[in-house]
Regions:
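Short, amphipathic alpha-helical "recognition" segments used to contact nucleic acids or chromatin
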Residues: 1
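Nucleic-acid-binding surface
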Residues: 4-9, 24, 32, 36-179
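Short amphipathic alpha-helical interaction segments
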Residues: 12-25
Length: 179
């Protein structure tokens, strides 16, 4: 995990947490979240730390597009949470609570710039979310996303998602204008 050590992983290997506490005191590791430490000479991965702290967070919208390699990194991190989970949301994340169907459709994994695996939505779902929530995107970002992602998207899967989210018309219009 690129310099990360999880306390739970140490416990599984019957290694006492006191060793990690000692190494933290010596400056070898630093605590970045409850139960998660990072080696001194490694840079923090904000996506991995957020995923570690909030296991049910799924990166969405522009953050998903970035993690999928479709857009440059954005200042704001966005993610979806299931209903009734952390009802206050997450500090520093533009989070939105969604129902089970919306939460699970298009779930995928992506590798962060630091090499860690985190949950996000697949390319097809990210394209549809740009159409469903255009107010969350800059117009240029939607156009850039469609130009880079639509040619390689699975068109049948895109249609399946559009039908599930009742946005076939928006997709057809976007394909005519941007695709």
């Amino acid at each position: 995990h690129d310099g990360y050590v999880e306390v739970a992983a140490l416990r599984e290997q019957n290694i006492a947490q006191t060793y990690l506490s000692y190494m933290e005191k010596e400056g070898i590791f630093r605590k970045v979240a409850k139960g998660l430490y990072l080696k001194r000479d490694h840079h923090e991965d904000p996506y991995y730390v957020l995923h570690y702290r909030y296991k049910k967070l799924v990166f969405s919208l522009q953050t998903s597009a970035f993690l999928q390699g479709l857009l440059p990194e954005q200042k704001e991190i966005s993610g979806y949470l299931p209903l009734n989970y952390l009802t206050q949301g997450i500090s520093g994340v533009a989070s939105r609570h969604v129902g089970q169907k919306e939460f699970t459709l298009g779930l995928s994994l992506a590798v962060t710039p630091r090499g860690n695996l985190v949950p996000c939505y697949d390319v097809e779902r990210t394209l549809l979310d740009a159409l469903r929530y255009p107010e969350k995107w800059e117009k240029e970002a939607i156009a850039a996303l469609f130009k880079s992602a639509y040619p390689k998207a699975d068109k049948a899967l895109l249609q399946t998602y559009a039908k599930a989210f009742h946005c076939e018309g928006e997709l057809a219009l976007a394909v005519r204008l941007l695709g």
